[in-house]
C-alpha cells in the first residue's frame, strides 16, 4: 500500500495471488486504478482471469478483468483497452501489441497503478534479458503518461527472489 515494489515468494497454492489481488481490486473499486498482470503462459493468464471473474461475481465488485493475448478477437481489443480494470497478458503481447500502440491505451496507462509479474523464475537467461528490456520500455511509457506503477513480482520456486526481482525491474525491490 506504500507503493514500494515487492517480491512475493511462497509455495504453490499458498495464496500468492490474494496478496496482490486484494489491493489491486480495492484500488480499482475506490480509485479507478488499473493493473497489468503478466504471466509467462496463456494457461496461467486464463486461470487468473477466471479467478478474478469468480471473485468479482461473488462480491458484485464491478471490476472488469480481461485476458489480452494473441487469441483475443480484434473487436474485443478496443473494449479491453477502454474498460479493462485488470488486463492479464504476457511479456510478448506487451512488447508487440500494447507498447507500440500505447496511444490507444492512453486511458489505461494514465491510471496504471500496479504491474504484477507472476512466475518470475521463468524470466532468466536470454528471455529474462528480453523481458527486462520490455519492462524498461513499459516504465518509459508510464513516465510519459505521468505514472510510476508499483511492481509486484511473484514466484514459488526461486532461490534468490530479491536479486532476481531487482534485476528484472532494475529498481529497488
Enumerate the predicted regions with their spans:
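Conserved P-loop/Walker A NTP-binding site and adjacent catalytic elements of P-loop NTPases
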Residues: 1-145, 149-154, 163-168
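Conserved H-loop
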Residues: 159-160
Amino acid at each position: 500500500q506504500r507503493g514500494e515494489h515487492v517480491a512475493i515468494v511462497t509455495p504453490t497454492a499458498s495464496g500468492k495471488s490474494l496478496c496482490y489481488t486484494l489491493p489491486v481490486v480495492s484500488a480499482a473499486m475506490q480509485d479507478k486504478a488499473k493493473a497489468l498482470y503478466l504471466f509467462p503462459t496463456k494457461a496461467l493468464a486464463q486461470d487468473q482471469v477466471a479467478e478474478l471473474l469468480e471473485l468479482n461475481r461473488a462480491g458484485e465488485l464491478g471490476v472488469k478483468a480481461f485476458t489480452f493475448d494473441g487469441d483475443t478477437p480484434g473487436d474485443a481489443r478496443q473494449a479491453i483497452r477502454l474498460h479493462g480494470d485488470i488486463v492479464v497478458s504476457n511479456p510478448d503481447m506487451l512488447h508487440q501489441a500494447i507498447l507500440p500502440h500505447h496511444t490507444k491505451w492512453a486511458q489505461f496507462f494514465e491510471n496504471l497503478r500496479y504491474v504484477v509479474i507472476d512466475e518470475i523464475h521463468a524470466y532468466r537467461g536470454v528471455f529474462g534479458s528480453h523481458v527486462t528490456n520490455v519492462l524498461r520500455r513499459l516504465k518509459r511509457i508510464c513516465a510519459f503518461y505521468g505514472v510510476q506503477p508499483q511492481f509486484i513480482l511473484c514466484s514459488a520456486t526461486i532461490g534468490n527472489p530479491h536479486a532476481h526481482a531487482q534485476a528484472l525491474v532494475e529498481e529497488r525491490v
